[in-house]
Swiss-Prot record:
Disease: Immunodeficiency-centromeric instability-facial anomalies syndrome 2: A rare disorder characterized by a variable immunodeficiency resulting in recurrent infections, facial anomalies, and branching of chromosomes 1, 9, and 16. Other variable symptoms include growth retardation, failure to thrive, and psychomotor retardation. Laboratory studies show limited hypomethylation of DNA in a small fraction of the genome in some, but not all, patients.
Residue ranges, compositional bias (Basic and acidic residues): 212-245
Zinc finger (C2H2-type): 294-316, 322-344, 350-372, 378-400, 406-428, 434-456, 462-484, 490-512
Protein name (database record): Zinc finger and BTB domain-containing protein 24
SUPFAM superfamilies recorded: beta-beta-alpha zinc fingers, POZ domain
Oligomeric and partner information: Interacts with MN1.
Gene Ontology terms: cellular component: nucleus
DNA-binding region residue numbers: 159-171
Length: 697
């Protein structure tokens, strides 16, 4: 209802009582439709869309957190340690001003409101308790479960000038008003009622506020064995008696979350008792009397409850009561066994909302999502450096401790942890411990085996949301989805050809690698062609048989000292020259390449016959001369006649030295070979050679 009041200056001031309710109702409608929601809060893998502005206006915790981030804020936040149903009820209050909850869950909701500093809810609950002083609060019976309905009083001054719904005096009026405003009543799940531990993880440590459901549990803080097994040690390992009032102890690493929250040391879970009152005192419960500390006798670590101490002591005794039925591996906690079992089943219950990647643990999901947000949530307490993943922080911490990263002894590659090194070592040893029982194929990693088994079963659980194509491996699906985006981020450095996937680029680079090797080989041969002709050897580019009257002519330079000839049983010889390189076969080209790759001064030319094809020379192993291309020297022609070849074949076991008789009238002379006994050449060039020595006149 609008009210108008005259002002002395003649101006009118119009006030609408319904405006604040209308704005809240509009926000709630937008939240349900997902319209203009600029933030996603994830609690126990449940996603809550919301508006940053309204959260900051309703919660001092969110307000300080957003203010600390400034302009680099993000859109996805993971709230650790909270209950999804409890947070949903609290978010409903922020958007409507009404709280609909069961009587047993109000304590946990109030503790969450205290931590998030939603003081309007705390004050509304205080007023509700004062106005309903009877032991049994007024309830609205829905499906047999008592439900407490709390709203802000109309006559209370709002903190931020926000209007609140009028206080309803009767249940019938309240019920009709809720129906008129189309409010949705959230029923609390039984699991919420059974939860007795509220854990909030922050950057500075772990803050635990235990809210008991019964007075006898307050006086005797014990836990049932079944609950003991399900509670991981990490929730209370860092407890310190000094943190009883809400001060978080300093831990070595910042805790697992996507966003870096406001330091918990500036907050108290139960709030300022002078201004806002204690949550437990409001609820009319007795405070748990202080008992003896649960301290570990081995390391002196302190725990809040004895069952946490019992779990911790297994780290000293080595007790692992939880055994895997598949491989027999033991674990100290039931939670660790459940995570391990997923390795056998392939279950990955945690899915990234950005890229749909599935992961086995919540911790893995938190670290993965930090890569999308770009937020570096893990802080080194020594130097203050930030990291996006916990393993990066652990690796960095070795700088302060002096410990080095695990290193492979074979290739000296370093790894983040020992488990990664262990997997890498299998690439050197060839070990493949994971074998498929169906086809016998082995793998180095268990994940590869699990993916392979899906092929036998025909399972393709990963489907593309665009074209519907299914895949047996999540990584294959991710690579496929990149094709739909049209992006090609991978570019070839050689030809600038772009690819959408990295594996396609690697396959493409192999083509350039082969071309480069072939180009290097041809450039080596081509660059030394002139030197080969001038300084080493030239034979006529044809094959001739010794059955005719033809002769073999060899052009050699003065730098040639010896020619070691090892004939085969065949009567024919074929050889390659530099001038005939364009007609070479692949084998001949390779042989000619060998001719140009020896570094020392020319001493021997070895012509060795091929065993399978004795008509052709298999290789020319010749050492280059050091003479430069600009130098000139006489070229001599050596003629090997039919008789000479026959003589070499007949006496290949004997050592002979052939002298050359020349004249100096022509730089290229035909030389006649004469035979004289001589010493054998060095035997390290060719086994059992028959040398032909050449002396220059």
């Amino acid at each position: 209802m609008a009210e108008t009041s005259p002002e002395p200056s003649g101006q009118l001031v119009v006030h609408s009582d319904a405006h604040s309710d209308t704005v809240l109702a509009s926000f709630e409608d937008q939240r349900k439709k997902g319209f203009l929601c600029d933030i996603t809060l994830i609690v126990e893998n449940v996603h809550f869309r919301a508006h940053k502005a309204l959260l900051a206006a309703s919660s001092e915790y969110f307000s300080m957190m957003f203010a600390e981030e400034g302009e680099i804020g993000q859109s996805i936040y993971m709230l650790e340690g909270m209950v999804a149903d409890t947070f949903g009820i609290l978010l409903e209050f922020i958007y409507t001003g009404y709280l609909h909850a069961s009587e047993k869950s109000t304590e946990q909701i109030l503790a969450t409101a205290q931590f998030l500093k939603v003081y309007d809810l705390v004050k509304a609950y205080t007023d509700f308790q004062n106005n309903h002083s009877s032991p049994k609060p007024t309830t609205l019976n829905t499906a047999g479960a008592p439900v407490v309905v709390i709203s802000n009083k109309k006559n209370d001054p709002p903190k931020r000038k926000r209007g609140r719904p009028k206080k309803v005096n009767t249940l019938q009026e309240e019920k009709s008003e809720l129906a008129a405003e189309e409010e949705i009543q959230l029923r609390v799940n039984n699991s919420v009622q059974n939860r007795q531990n509220f854990v909030v993880k922050g950057d500075s440590g772990v803050l635990n506020e235990q809210i008991a459901a019964k007075e006898k549990e307050e006086s005797e803080p014990t836990c049932e064995p079944s609950r003991e097994e399900e509670m991981p040690v990490e929730k209370d390992e860092n407890y310190d008696p000094k943190t009883e009032d809400g001060q978080a102890s300093q831990s070595r690493y910042s805790k697992r979350r996507i966003w870096r929250s406001v330091k918990l040391k500036d907050y108290k879970l139960v709030g300022d008792q002078e201004d806002h009152g204690s949550a437990k005192r409001i609820c009319g419960r007795r405070k748990r009397p202080g008992g003896p500390e649960a301290r570990c006798k081995d390391c002196g670590k302190v725990f809040k409850y004895n069952h946490f101490l019992a779990i911790h002591q297994r780290s000293h005794t080595g007790e692992r009561p939880f055994k895997c039925n598949e491989c027999g591996k033991g674990f100290a906690q039931k939670h660790s066994l459940q995570v391990h079992t997923r390795m056998h089943t392939g279950e990955r219950p945690y899915t990234c909302t950005v890229c749909s990647k599935a992961l086995t643990t919540k911790h893995s999901l938190l670290e993965h999502m930090s890569l999308h947000s770009g937020q570096k949530s893990f802080t080194c307490d020594q130097c203050g450096k930030y990291f996006s993943q916990n393993r990066q922080l652990k690796s960095h911490y070795r700088v302060h401790t002096g410990h080095s990263l695990p290193e492979c002894k074979d290739c000296h590659r370093k790894f983040m942890d020992v488990s990664q090194l262990k997997k890498h070592l299998r690439t050197h040893t060839g070990e493949k411990p994971f074998t498929c029982e169906i086809c016998g194929k082995s793998f180095t990693a268990k994940s590869s085996l699990q993916t392979h088994i899906r092929i036998h079963r025909g399972e393709k659980p990963y489907s593309c949301g665009i074209c519907g194509k299914s895949f047996s491996d999540s990584s294959a699906k991710r690579r496929h989805c990149i094709l739909h985006t049209g992006k090609k981020p991978f570019s070839c450095p050689e030809c600038n050809l772009q690819f959408a996937r990295l594996d396609n680029l690697k396959a493409h680079l192999k083509i350039h690698s082969k071309e480069k090797h072939a180009s290097d080989a041809s450039s080596i041969s081509g660059s030394s062609n002139t030197e080969e002709v001038r300084n080493i050897l030239q034979l006529q580019p044809y094959q001739l048989s010794t059955s005719g009257e033809q002769e073999i002519q060899l052009l050699v330079t003065d730098s040639v000292h010896n020619i070691n000839f090892m004939p085969g049983p065949s009567q024919g010889i074929s050889i390659v020259t530099a001038e005939s390189s364009q007609n070479m076969t692949a084998d001949q080209a390779a042989n000619l390449t060998l001719l140009t790759q020896q570094p020392e001064q020319l001493q021997n030319l070895i012509l060795s016959a091929q065993q399978e094809q004795t008509e052709h020379i298999q290789s020319l192993n010749m050492i280059e001369s050091q003479m430069g291309p600009s130098q000139t020297e006489p070229v001599h022609v050596i003629t090997l006649s039919k008789e000479t070849l026959e003589h070499l074949h007949a006496h290949q076991e004997q050592t002979e030295e052939l002298h050359l008789a020349t004249s100096t009238s022509d730089p290229a002379q035909h030389l006649q070979l004469t035979q004289e006994p001589g010493p054998p050449p060095p035997t390290h060039h060719v086994p059992q050679p028959t040398p032909l020595g050449q002396e220059q006149s």
